């Protein structure tokens, strides 16, 4: 490399550093309207924009597979046309990767939220923007943590929402959501950092429509409908732990070696160790409980508890649940426990439908207390699309008949065959 080229490269590097420095200082000085976001949020935002980590290396694949991915996403163009996805997990993954940054930017830069009304919320859903719908309400502070924000904007911390959207209105961006606890609607102006139009313009509207756009009197007006999707498959279910190799791997993950051997009670293997006891049923259900008293060395936040539980799910159920195009394990909800700690619930979602796994509907529940897992129940299943067709009422008619909020569901009663149905939400035992 000659001296002139070397000088030019140094100049280019200096220019890049100066630009980054200016952007960083602007961020820190609230130049972009980020009223409460910190430098960590800037780095998370930079990673989301560049697709890499702070050190410049590519972001790991796990980054796009957060426990709180939505079960429905809609892009709305300037004319009010929607491109919606609900039933294809691969399409949901792709859209999530390309649209999560709008919510990262909104949650980190929002002005204090202001109460608004249903009419404004409906207008927002028909405006240029991006819409996320979750299987259960998610605390916005937790959603921010999944997106890489250390602290969401002031006023958003305590809110929880199933449905939220970020819109572009006259060159200004706004976050809208419905608070789950009160049912009230809120909006907050946010910074304009990424062009929503660039993303929505890459897709042509499909049949997606919100229920209120077809029927103003709908009992579930904000349900996203896909009228052109008229067929939903039946599913086949199997117990992956019937494989000796899979069983051995799962046992090792859970801290169980082959010796000493378990004893058996009513077709259930019982493993007793110094610091835990574990039951493995012949239907693939694992019940694990810590036996020693957990040291109280720190308080676990809700976000930390969910992350810890999600890591366990990734190492266990997610490895055996089936093809990633068909099924995934989704975060469902959190219960704060008396005496401290959190119980985290997860659910299988297959072919775009929530699996109701008997007896209580969940794929797993994991309790985290004092910085460690103290108890868990894991229900191992492998789901695949059945070759037999399923008969189901079309979605639009189901919306009219539901009398409330609903989504596609599958009832796993242990028979091995799951037919689709339209249950009302919330999905609880």
Residue ranges and their predicted role:
Residues 309, 344, 364-366, 405, ...:
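Conserved histidines in hydrophobic membrane contexts and catalytic metal-binding motifs
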Residues 357-392:
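Short helix-loop boundary/capping segments
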Residues 1-7:
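N-terminal Lys/Arg-rich, disordered targeting/topogenic segments
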Residues 257-283, 292, 297-353:
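Secondary-structure-rich domain cores
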Residues 10-18:
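Sec-dependent signal peptide hydrophobic core
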Residues 17-304, 427-428:
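Preferential activation on post-signal-peptide N-terminal prodomains/segments
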Residues 332-369, 401-404, 410-412:
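Aromatic/basic-lined ligand-recognition segments
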Residues 92, 96-121, 238-253, 296-338, ...:
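Short, non-transmembrane alpha-helical segments in secretory-pathway proteins
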């Amino acid at each position: 490399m000659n001296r002139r080229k070397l000088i030019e490269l140094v100049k280019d590097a200096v220019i890049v550093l100066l630009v980054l420095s200016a952007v960083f200082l602007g961020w820190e000085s609230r130049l972009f309207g980020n009223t409460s976001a910190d430098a960590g949020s800037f780095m998370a935002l930079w990673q989301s924009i560049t697709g890499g980590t702070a050190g410049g290396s590519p972001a790991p694949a796990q980054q796009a597979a957060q426990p709180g991915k939505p079960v429905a996403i809609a892009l709305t163009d300037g004319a009010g046309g929607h491109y919606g996805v609900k039933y294809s997990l691969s399409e949901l993954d792709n859209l999530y990767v390309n649209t999560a940054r709008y919510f990262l930017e909104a949650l980190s830069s929002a002005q204090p939220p202001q109460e608004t009304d249903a009419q404004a919320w409906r207008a927002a859903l028909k405006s240029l923007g991006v819409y996320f719908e979750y299987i259960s309400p998610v605390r916005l502070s937790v959603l921010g943590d999944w997106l890489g924000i250390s602290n969401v904007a002031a006023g958003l911390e305590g809110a929880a929402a199933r449905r939220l959207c970020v819109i572009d209105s006259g060159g200004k961006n706004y976050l809208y959501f419905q608070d789950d606890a009160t049912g009230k609607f809120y909006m907050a102006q946010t910074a304009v950092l990424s062009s929503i139009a660039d993303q929505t313009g890459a897709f042509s509207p499909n049949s997606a429509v919100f229920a209120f756009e077809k029927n103003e009197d709908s009992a579930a007006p904000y349900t996203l409908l896909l009228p052109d999707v008229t067929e939903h498959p039946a599913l086949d279910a199997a117990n992956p732990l019937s494989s000796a190799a899979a069983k051995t791997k799962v046992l090792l993950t859970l801290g169980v070696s082959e010796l000493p051997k378990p004893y058996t009670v009513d077709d259930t293997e019982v493993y007793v160790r110094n610091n835990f006891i574990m039951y493995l049923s012949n239907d693939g259900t694992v019940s694990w409980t810590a036996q020693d008293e957990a040291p109280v060395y720190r308080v676990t936040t809700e976000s930390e508890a969910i992350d810890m539980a999600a890591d366990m799910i990734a190492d266990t159920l997610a490895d055996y649940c089936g093809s990633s195009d068909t099924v995934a394990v989704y975060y469902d909800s959190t219960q704060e426990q008396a005496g401290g700690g959190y119980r985290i619930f997860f659910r299988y979602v297959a072919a775009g439908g929530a699996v109701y796994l008997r007896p209580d509907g969940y794929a797993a529940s994991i309790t985290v207390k004092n910085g460690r897992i103290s108890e868990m129940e894991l229900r191992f299943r492998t789901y695949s699309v059945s070759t037999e067709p399923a008969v189901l009422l079309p979605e639009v008619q189901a919306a009219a008949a539901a009398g409330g909020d609903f989504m596609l569901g599958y009832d796993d009663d242990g028979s091995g065959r799951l037919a689709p149905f339209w249950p009302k939400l919330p999905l609880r035992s």
